[in-house]
A protein has these predicted regions:
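Glycine-rich "HGGG/HGxG" loop immediately N-terminal to the catalytic nucleophile
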Residues: 1-10, 207
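Alpha/beta-hydrolase fold nucleophile elbow
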Residues: 30-41
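Short beta-strand/loop motif that positions the catalytic acidic residue
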Residues: 152, 158-160
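Alpha/beta-hydrolase active-site loop
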Residues: 8-28
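Active-site nucleophile elbow and catalytic-triad environment of alpha/beta-hydrolase enzymes
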Residues: 127-148
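Catalytic active-site module of serine/aspartate enzymes centered on a nucleophile-bearing elbow/loop
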Residues: 196-234
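Conserved loop-alpha-helix segment in the C-terminal half of the alpha/beta-hydrolase fold
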Residues: 162-201
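Alpha/beta-hydrolase-fold enzymes
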Residues: 42, 46-131
Length: 234
C-alpha cells in the first residue's frame, strides 16, 4: 500500500489476477515449475477465483486458509442488504459502507492485547475501515461465480477452524475460533470447488490459522506438508 492508494477500492477481483500472473511468470523464469498457490480469507477467494477462470494455469495445487467464500451475515443481510449494496456499487462505486467497529479479532492477534504478534497496522488495520460499495459488489460477484461451479482442476486443501465466534468485543473464546467468517459456510462451499478437495478442520484455530497458538499452528503446518507429500506436489 503506497501513498495515494485507497484500501478496499476495487471494481472486479480480476484486477488482482495480473499480480498472480506476474508472480507465476517470474517463477517460471527462475526455473520453478512446481507451484502451489495459497490464499487466506479474501486472498483465498481470489486464488480460487483465479484458478476457476484460468484452468490452464501452471499451478499444481491450491491451499486455502479460511477462504472468504460467503458473507458472514444473517439472512436479511445476505438476501437483501448485500445485493442492494452491490447495485449501489454499480451506480456509486465510491460510496462508503461501514464494517462496524469490532476489534475482538485484532485483539486476539496483537501482542499488546491478547495475542503474540506485532505487525504493521497501516496494512492490517486495528479499527475496521469503511469499504467502497464497489468492493462489496466485486466480492459478491466472485463468490456467486464460485458457487455456481468453480470447476477447479488441481487438488485443493481446504482448511478452517472448527468453530466461529461472534461479537464486537474480545472474550477468551476469540483465541480459539474464527472471529471473521462462518466456518460452516467455508465447508459447505469449499467442498464443491473441485473434484479433489481435502478438508481439514483445525481445532482451536483462529481466522488466520497460521497465526493461531503455537500448538495449533504446528498442526496446521503438519497438515500442509503432509498433504503436499500425499499429493506428490513436492
Amino acid at each position: 500500500i503506497t501513498e495515494g492508494q485507497h484500501l478496499f477500492q476495487v471494481r472486479d477481483l480480476k484486477e488482482y489476477f495480473a499480480d498472480i500472473d506476474s508472480a507465476l511468470a517470474q517463477m517460471h523464469a527462475d526455473g520453478i515449475d512446481t507451484i502451489a498457490l495459497m490464499g487466506h480469507s479474501t486472498g483465498g477467494l481470489i486464488s480460487a477465483y483465479y484458478l476457476s477462470e484460468n484452468p490452464d494455469s501452471p499451478v499444481k495445487a491450491l491451499l486455502l486458509n479460511s477462504p472468504f467464500l460467503d458473507w458472514n451475515f444473517n439472512g436479511f443481510m445476505r438476501k437483501v442488504a448485500i445485493p442492494a449494496f452491490g447495485a449501489l456499487g454499480r451506480l456509486f462505486p465510491d460510496l462508503a459502507i461501514s464494517q462496524g467497529d469490532g476489534t475482538g479479532y485484532q485483539e486476539s492477534l496483537l501482542k499488546k492485547h491478547h495475542g503474540e504478534w506485532n505487525y504493521n497496522q497501516d496494512w492490517k488495520l486495528f479499527h475496521p475501515q469503511k469499504v467502497d460499495a464497489s468492493w462489496t459488489r466485486a466480492i459478491s460477484s466472485a463468490q456467486n461465480k464460485i458457487k455456481k461451479g468453480a470447476g477447479i482442476r488441481v487438488p485443493i486443501l481446504l482448511m478452517h477452524s472448527d468453530k466461529s465466534v461472534d461479537g464486537d468485543h474480545w472474550t477468551p473464546e476469540f483465541q480459539h475460533a474464527d472471529a471473521v467468517l462462518n466456518v460452516k459456510d467455508i465447508s459447505r462451499i469449499g467442498r464443491k470447488l473441485g473434484q479433489d478437495v481435502t478438508e481439514d478442520t483445525i481445532r482451536g484455530g483462529l481466522h488466520d490459522l497460521v497465526l493461531s497458538s503455537p500448538p495449533v499452528r504446528e498442526q496446521v503446518y503438519n497438515y500442509i506438508f503432509s498433504w503436499l507429500r500425499q499429493k506428490h506436489i513436492f
